[in-house]
Each structure stands twice: as structure tokens, then as C-alpha cells.
Amino acid sequence: MAIRPLHDRVIIKREEVETLSAGGIVLTGSAATKSTRAKVLAVGKGRVLENGTVQPLDVKVGDTVIFNDGYGVKAEKIDGEEVLIISENDILAIVE
């Protein structure tokens, strides 16, 4: 299934988190935190400004980003995989 985000929305897939501690202990449950790094899968056309022009997004498909995992993050299952739909405002940085 193809999915295309609207406006300033971005679809990302969370990166896997290392489940071993520095001492070699396997972390499970609440001890294993979710990653806030993700790969950008799709981007909308941009934010519509008050004057009607569209401001393109700074992120592009394939970028690795660090995002704010909180209110406004929508999780969805697409073809059996969990993806997140977020606003570009929730992206804190692009990893280069």
C-alpha cells in the first residue's frame, strides 16, 4: 500500500534500539527505551503559508532524523510495519 502525507506531514520508520546494555545485559520492557531516530519514508508537499504559497520541507526521503516522540505523533500499521506520521515541526535534527 502506498501512503502520501499531506502538507507538512512526514512519514518515518523508527530505527531499532540496541537491546544490550554496556555491560552486556539484555534490556527488556520499560528498560529498553524506544529510539527517537528514524528514517524518512515520505514527505508532504510543504506547509501552506497565510499568503497561500507552499513552503517546501527541509527533510527529504531517505534522511535519518531525530524527532520529538510525544503528543501529535500518530502510529499506523502499513503493510504490517509500524510507521509514524508526524509534523515537520516535531523533527529536531537531520543526522548527517
From Swiss-Prot:
GO terms for cellular component: cytoplasm. Keywords: Chaperone, Cytoplasm. GO terms for molecular function: ATP binding; metal ion binding; protein folding chaperone; protein-folding chaperone binding; unfolded protein binding. GO terms for biological process: chaperone cofactor-dependent protein refolding. Together with the chaperonin GroEL, plays an essential role in assisting protein folding. The GroEL-GroES system forms a nano-cage that allows encapsulation of the non-native substrate proteins and provides a physical environment optimized to promote and accelerate protein folding. GroES binds to the apical surface of the GroEL ring, thereby capping the opening of the GroEL channel. Pfam families: Cpn10 (PF00166). InterPro entries: Chaperonin_GroES (IPR020818), Chaperonin_GroES_sf (IPR037124), Chaprnonin_Cpn10_CS (IPR018369), GroES-like_sf (IPR011032). Heptamer of 7 subunits arranged in a ring. Interacts with the chaperonin GroEL. It is found in: Cytoplasm. Gene3D superfamilies: GroES chaperonin. Its main location: cytoplasm. This is Co-chaperonin GroES. SMART domains: Cpn10. It comes from Actinobacillus succinogenes (strain ATCC 55618 / DSM 22257 / CCUG 43843 / 130Z). Belongs to the GroES chaperonin family.
